[in-house]
Amino acid sequence: MTSLSESDAGSSARPTMRHVAKLAGVAVKTVSRVVNGEPNVAPETARRVLDAARALDYQPDPHAGNLRRSDRRTRTLGLLVSSVDNPFAGAVHRAVEDVAVEHGVAVFASSLDDDPEREREAVAAFLRRRVDGLILTTASTNQAYLEPELRRGTPVVFVDREPRGVETDAVVSDNFGGAARAAEHLLARGHRRFAYLGDLHSLQTARHRRRGFLEALDHAGIPVADVPVIEDLHDPERAREALLRLLDGPNPPTAVFSSQNLVTVGALRALRERGRHRDTALVGFDDVELADLLEPGLTVVAQHPEDLGRIAAERVFAKLNGDGSPSQRIVVSTTLIARGSGEIPPSGM
């Protein structure tokens, strides 16, 4: 294949068919035929074109015929959230869309269900659509695969979870501090027997919450090695079963911290199933719909997903408008809302 200089490849722009054609030593029309799966292309020629496309990280543009504006923007964003089952993700999505609408921009959204492979597939789909910017919640352990896109100048902002392997903006909750505050709240009520119910350990947010909760207990003199820590409880049923086992054990906790809203739902069901919802304290991370209507009301460390989504979207548009400031890590504070379940004292007090 023909060699291609950095200036030819346009290091600050996405590769085009022209770049692929030059590297493969063929006509642009030949590249178009290969990309579109048209017949009458020799197998060896098609192989050279595909090899060149891979080498340049070329992504076909399904809307190329519609791109005639001088700025070449599609007026779209790609948004990747954790799971459509989780109200938190829905609130982030809504906030991003509210900002995008103000700018006359549409949002393509997808959920990853905390699957690293799905993350990369969704991002690739967004890039094929030539979105102007990306707002991403991640599940994979490294996002270095986005480096070529960042070099081309595509604005990328991470929301809820920080990236690894790339330097760019991230907007996150104070997961460590919020979990520590939950522990301090329960300690202040006199509790000494705790249980921790955690989300997937592979998730950065879950690890930060676990660390915040356990370090606060440790600072208060609680032997954390004796605290039951049960993780990878990603849905209500697993959380329910885990807490039932603890409640039925020889030394049940007097206070429970659940590190995610769906886990909290399972914990609530277990406590009510055993008739322990009035004598076992519970604090959840993330608010739960109708939490104030329960009896007792549910005490939570509330995140502010609407702020996370809004700030992330504002950062993308700032970058699109020429903001070249260094990468920022923006931490959004959490709020402990006391409604009753977290204020239950241990039996005998």
Task: List the predicted regions and their residue ranges.
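Flexible loop/turn connectors
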Residues: 249-349
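Short beta-strand-centered segments that line the small-molecule binding cleft or hinge
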Residues: 120-177
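Short helix-capping segments at alpha-helix termini
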Residues: 102-103, 152, 217-224, 249-252, ...
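N-terminal helix-turn-helix DNA-binding module of bacterial transcription factors
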Residues: 1-73, 343-346
